[in-house]
């Protein structure tokens, strides 16, 4: 079942044509990887799905991004959209407050004030992010004292606390060590049971390990999109084959 349908999506930074007629369906219960060389448009595309590009001047968008049957650029309030479409960034960005308050931040903004209810949300979110057992005895400690990998999982917990329906990840492990990377990759396999995940990654091995579907971007276009096994082992376009095999990138 499709949760997002992208139809003829183009994006311009001023006169620069950054995304060119993108068509793609994102399915439930899957991890979709976006791969391609630097500057190919994959992060711009990711930010188009929750309207993060709205913060950039001189951006113009054509086409449609359909989420639950509605065009996000015409029929959605952007605040509500970003609650329903969570985002995890390349660099962990915990707020300068306690671990507890980091996770409770979103629910509080959306009107939840009851302490018992917040306690339940915080514990549930940290457990889903595979972090609870490591920090349950220091919830009132400053979140910025956590390790890099723990901080990134905290950011995932913070995203989960507002009950999103889709999770976007922009190179979430690029600054992490192999052990922390492995934990987050395992977490993605668990999360996809409840949340579709779209991840930008420069790591071909990672894309192969974690994703069900893969889209290869080049110069603002989707060159090829399909099952990850097909993209990696039976690409239909020579450019895809060249990129996967390391001939450029």
UniProtKB/Swiss-Prot annotation:
Pfam families: ABC_tran. InterPro entries: AAA+_ATPase (IPR003593), ABC_transporter-like_ATP-bd (IPR003439), ABC_transporter-like_CS (IPR017871), P-loop_NTPase (IPR027417), PstB-like (IPR005670). Keywords: ATP-binding, Cell membrane, Membrane, Nucleotide-binding, Phosphate transport, Translocase, Transport. Gene3D superfamilies: P-loop containing nucleotide triphosphate hydrolases. One of its GO terms (cellular component) is plasma membrane. It is an enzyme of class 7 (translocase). CDD domains: ABC_PstB_phosphate_transporter. GO terms for molecular function: ATP binding; ATP hydrolysis activity; ATPase-coupled phosphate ion transmembrane transporter activity. It is found in: Cell membrane. Residues 4-244 form the ABC transporter domain. Its main location: membrane. ATP binds at residues 36-43. One of its GO terms (biological process) is phosphate ion transmembrane transport. NCBIfam families: 3a0107s01c2. The complex is composed of two ATP-binding proteins (PstB), two transmembrane proteins (PstC and PstA) and a solute-binding protein (PstS). This is Phosphate import ATP-binding protein PstB. It comes from Clostridium tetani (strain Massachusetts / E88). The gene is pstB.
């Amino acid at each position: 079942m499709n949760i997002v349908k992208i139809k003829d999506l183009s994006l311009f930074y001023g006169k620069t044509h950054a995304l060119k007629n993108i068509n793609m369906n994102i399915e439930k219960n899957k991890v979709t990887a976006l791969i391609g060389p630097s500057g190919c448009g994959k992060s711009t595309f990711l930010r188009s799905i929750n309207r993060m590009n709205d913060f950039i001047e001189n951006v113009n968008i054509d086409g449609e991004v359909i989420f639950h049957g509605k065009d996000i650029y015409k029929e959605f309030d952007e605040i509500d959209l970003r609650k329903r479409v969570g985002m995890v960034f390349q660099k962990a960005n915990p707020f300068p407050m306690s671990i507890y308050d980091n996770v409770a931040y979103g629910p509080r903004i959306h009107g939840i004030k009851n302490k018992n209810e917040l306690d339940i949300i915080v514990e549930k979110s940290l457990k889903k992010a595979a972090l609870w057992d490591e920090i349950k005895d220091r919830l009132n400690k400053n979140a910025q004292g956590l390790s890099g990998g723990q901080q990134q999982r905290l950011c995932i917990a913070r995203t989960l606390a507002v009950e999103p329906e889709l999770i976007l990840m922009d190179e979430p492990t690029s600054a992490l060590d192999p052990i922390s990377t492995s934990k987050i990759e395992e977490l993605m396999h668990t999360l996809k049971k409840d949340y579709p995940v779209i991840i930008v990654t420069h790591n071909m091995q990672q894309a192969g390990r974690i994703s069900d579907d893969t889209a290869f971007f080049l110069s603002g276009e989707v060159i090829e999109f399909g099952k990850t096994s097909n993209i990696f082992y039976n690409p239909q376009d020579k450019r895809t084959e060249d990129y996967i095999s390391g001939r450029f990138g």
